[in-house]
């Protein structure tokens, strides 16, 4: 019973961070959209769902993307030739959760992003230069409900959520580019601070206790972006005539799925929980609602995700490091259209990271 109440306590708080930080570790551009973490670890001796309470969560995420993939094939020559694109992205997430009773809660999250992108092709092709962006990202507001009464259900539970992603991040962030003469223009889609769309968020989170030490967790997340394009010029049309319909930035959907298991130590180490699981995140070729025109880099990353948590009475420290095991830059809408027009399979590329580093802390206020 004590283990269950601890586990239930952290779920609504720890759900705050991983999901919105669905950054897909690279040029498959899924930026942070408010706070979300995962249903991994126990914390606190009080049952979060049994009383009215506030929780504040802060987390940090970093990755460096530099390995180019076209489909699942790595373009190793990019690093040999020195023309790979290198993205550095840091995200600071702040989220606050209000628990109303044992069923209902609401979460508001807002990220702050700091991005650097180094390339040759955006700066004339001969010299490497960097572009930059920083500022708040897109906010998310989600209302969640547990399906079963935590006072009566002790083996497991399922939480469903519905919310919105608001376009609070700048989707036309600009930096200086060097093509013969310096010029200020929009940065690449992968380091834009927002996407300009009002998204519809749906999520399902669940856990199941196997024993007093072992439990399982799952998270399913989808954000539908009905807006088609956001008006931010990409300059893709200047690269090749076949990319003319990619001159405008698309507003893509996002998805995340996680499945794993937790082990909570006993005795003097009962505050420590370790977890392991798999994580799938990315953006689809076509959106669930509305058109899918403009430029996007669709694809996904499948990662192995070790994590740990250390819980005190009113505070929880957590960290995880998703390690990419499969990276796939899928055919975009433009790729498919050009494949039909030429009779030859066309597919673009994207840069991915090997791993990302995530850590944070949650407080009961």
Regions found by a protein language model. Name each.
Residues 25-28, 44-53, 65-67, 103, ...:
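Short loop/turn motifs that connect adjacent beta-strands in outer-membrane beta-barrel proteins
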């Amino acid at each position: 019973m004590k283990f269950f109440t601890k586990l239930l306590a952290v779920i609504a708080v720890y759900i705050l961070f991983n999901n919105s930080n669905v950054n897909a570790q690279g040029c498959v551009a899924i930026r942070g959209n408010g706070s979300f973490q995962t249903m991994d670890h126990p914390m606190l001796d009080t049952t979060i769902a049994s009383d009215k309470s506030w929780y504040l969560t802060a987390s940090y995420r970093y990755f460096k993307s530099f390995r180019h993939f076209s489909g699942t094939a790595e373009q190793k020559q990019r690093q040999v030739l020195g023309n790979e694109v290198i993205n550095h992205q840091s995200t600071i997430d702040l989220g606050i959760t209000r628990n109303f009773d044992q069923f209902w809660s609401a979460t508001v999250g807002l990220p702050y992003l700091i991005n650097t992108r180094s390339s040759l092709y955006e700066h004339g092709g001969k010299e490497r230069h960097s572009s930059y962006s920083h500022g708040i990202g897109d906010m998310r507001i989600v209302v969640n409900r547990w399906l079963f009464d935590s006072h009566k259900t002790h083996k497991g539970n399922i939480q469903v959520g519905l919310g919105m992603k608001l376009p609070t991040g700048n989707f036309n962030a600009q930096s200086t580019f060097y093509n013969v003469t310096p010029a200020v223009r929009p940065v690449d889609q992968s380091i834009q601070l927002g996407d300009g769309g009002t998204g519809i968020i749906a999520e399902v989170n669940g856990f199941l206790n196997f024993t007093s030490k072992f439990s399982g967790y799952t998270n399913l997340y989808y954000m539908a972006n009905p807006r088609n394009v956001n008006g931010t010029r990409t300059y893709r049309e200047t690269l090749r005539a076949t990319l003319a319909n990619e001159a405008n930035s698309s507003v893509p959907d996002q998805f995340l799925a996680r499945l794993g298991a937790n082990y909570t130590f006993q005795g003097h180490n009962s505050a420590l929980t370790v977890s392991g699981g798999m994580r799938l995140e990315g953006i689809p070729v076509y959106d669930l609602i509305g058109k899918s025109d403009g430029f996007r880099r669709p694809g996904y990353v499948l990662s192995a995700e070790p994590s740990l948590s250390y819980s005190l009475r009113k505070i929880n420290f957590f960290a995880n490091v998703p390690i990419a095991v499969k990276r796939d830059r899928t055919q975009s809408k433009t790729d498919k259209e050009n494949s039909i027009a030429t009779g030859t399979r066309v597919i673009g590329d994207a840069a991915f990271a090997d791993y990302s580093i995530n850590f944070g802390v949650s407080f009961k206020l």
